Structures are given as C-alpha cells and as structure tokens.
Amino acid sequence: MTLNKVFFSGGEEIRDLCIVGGGPTGIFAAFQCGMNNISCRIIESMTQLGGQLAALYPEKHIYDVAGFPEVPAAGLVESLWKQAERYNPDVVLGEAVTRYSKLDDGSFEITTTSGSVYHSRAVLLAAGLGAFTPRKLPQLNAIDHLEGHSVFYAVKNMQDFAGKKVVIIGGGDSALDWAVGLLPVAERVTLVHRMHEFQGHGKTARDVEEAKERGAIDVYLNTEVTAIDTSGENLTKVHLCKKNGTGFQVEADRLLVLIGFKSNLGPLADWDLELVDNALVVDSHMKTSVDGLYAAGDIAFYPGKLKIIQTGLSDAAMAVRHSLTYIRPGEKVKHTFSSVKMAREKKNAK
C-alpha cells in the first residue's frame, strides 16, 4: 500500500467532491463516494494519508472502533485505505488548501499552497482540528537540540524507547496509554502529572494504577518538571517538584511530553464560515453555512458531538450522502446496501 507519495492522476478535471483532509474521516469519505458513484479527490497537507494516526502515533493501539477489539493506528489507516482504493480516488499529498471560491455555476475552485487549482462540484472539509503542534513545557528552555533524540512529543517508533528509562509527562489518554504501552520495551517508566488525578479514560487509569501496585511503574501526582540534566545530546536526569515544595530527581534517558496539542484551522478560519469552539457549525446533513460545502469529523460541530474516530466515520457517510442533493440536484437519492453493491461489482468483474 502506498500512502506517502502523490498518485494524483486526474489533472485539472472537475470532480464531484473535493475532500480536504486525508485522515480516517477523509479516507472513509472517499470510500463512501465510491459507494454512491461520486468522483472525488482527497487533498492532504501532509506527505502521507492517515492524519494524526499516521503522523503522531502509528504504533498506538486503538480500542474504541466498532469491529476492532484492538487495532494499531497504522493498521486502521491501512484498512480504511484498502476500502477506499477500490474506487481509485484521486489523491494529492503535501499540499495544504489555502482558499476556496464558489463560482457562478455553484461549483468550487480550491487553491493550495503549491499554487495548484482544483475544481469540484461540492467540498467536504475533513481536516480534523486543522494544523496541530504539540504543547511543550514552557519551563524547559533551549531543548530543541534534544527533540527527536532524548525529548519526544509522540511515539512514532517504540524502539526509540527500548531499554531506556522513560519519564512521561501528562495525565490524559495518550500519557496513560503510553505509560502502559511502553512497559514491555522500556527499562523503567515514570509517569508525572501536575494534577491530583488523571484525566484519561477510566480503564486506562486503572491499568496504570495496577501497574503501579505491582511495582512496574512509578507514578507522581501533584508534581511538575522543573529542569533536566543532560550530557551533550543525552538526557540524564529529570528534576521534579511536588506542590508542597519537595524537590527530587529521577534518572532518565527519554522524556516523553504528552500534554496535548495546539490546533490551528489556518486559512479555514478566514473562510467566513460559522464557527463554535474552533469547529465549523453544521446542520443535520453535515452542511456548513455555505451551500455545497460540508464538514465531517473533529472539524465539524453540532450539539452533542463526540470527537472520536467512530463519529468521524459516521459524519463522513452522512456528508457524502447528502452532498448528492447538491451535486445532482433533482436526482432521487437511492440507498444501496454495501453487500448488494459489492456482489454486483464482483459479478460484473467476471
């Protein structure tokens, strides 16, 4: 499977739907386009498909996607692409969308950072939370030279932590997941959180507590990092301080900072679309305040929205389905069960 090269081959030919964002929501939207006989083009700013799953934690295991009791993030991306690629969607990688124009005939013109212009009859924004950068520890200055060697903000390869004394900063899902996930490879794992309790999922928090009780992990709550000791590009110690003022040190080879990300919608924020909490307001058909422009996944807001992968996939199916009424006005939208469509395709392929 090729997920890290441009295999766009459609030239400037107009497509029914332009999907902005190649994460799980965008990839599944491409599959749904195939199911509904809609031509589509994915435009992704990164050089690979998969969004945060591929870029930040490809080896992280995910447990809350229906039908997958446990699946590596990279494996989920592969499965989603295997579904979508049967319909040969056009894919453009390494180009970020900068602006859109709605033309007199109701179609859209999309411009990217490369200066390329793409045309579509409708647009689906599936760009997640937009551009994301990891939150860093403001009290640690001038550690850029350690990043990617001794200091990390994501786990892209577990071997980076194999046989190492790892200090993890954070108390959310990612911090808890990796505190447990790195136990099989790390020499020692220490989890540090500035609050008095974890903010992560209950089950994962219990897993951490169980690991602590059996002596497999050190946990320090109400504690913050104050400084680090280094030898060249190598981390040697992390200085910690409890809220009562007690300071102490722990030996460390790796510092893994997992305190969240800062998101930025970038040019999308200037598209004169209705926003709530840095997300685009959509109606029950996943349509934004602009006719023909839809949103799905984390970038979409509606009352009761739950920001998980499963919801994004549902959003994608809804958005693609309802985009048909804009792409082909007046045409009756018919639902075809996937089992029926696939059986028909297999029969026709013989």
Curated annotation (Swiss-Prot):
Signal peptide: none annotated. Binds 1 FAD per subunit. It holds the Pfam family Pyr_redox_2. Its EC number is 1.18.1.2. The keyword Nucleus does not apply. It is an enzyme of class 1 (oxidoreductase). GO terms for molecular function: ferredoxin-NADP+ reductase activity; flavin adenine dinucleotide binding; NADP binding. The keyword GTP-binding does not apply. PANTHER family: THIOREDOXIN REDUCTASE 1-RELATED-RELATED. Homodimer. This is Ferredoxin--NADP reductase. It comes from Chlorobium phaeobacteroides (strain DSM 266 / SMG 266 / 2430).
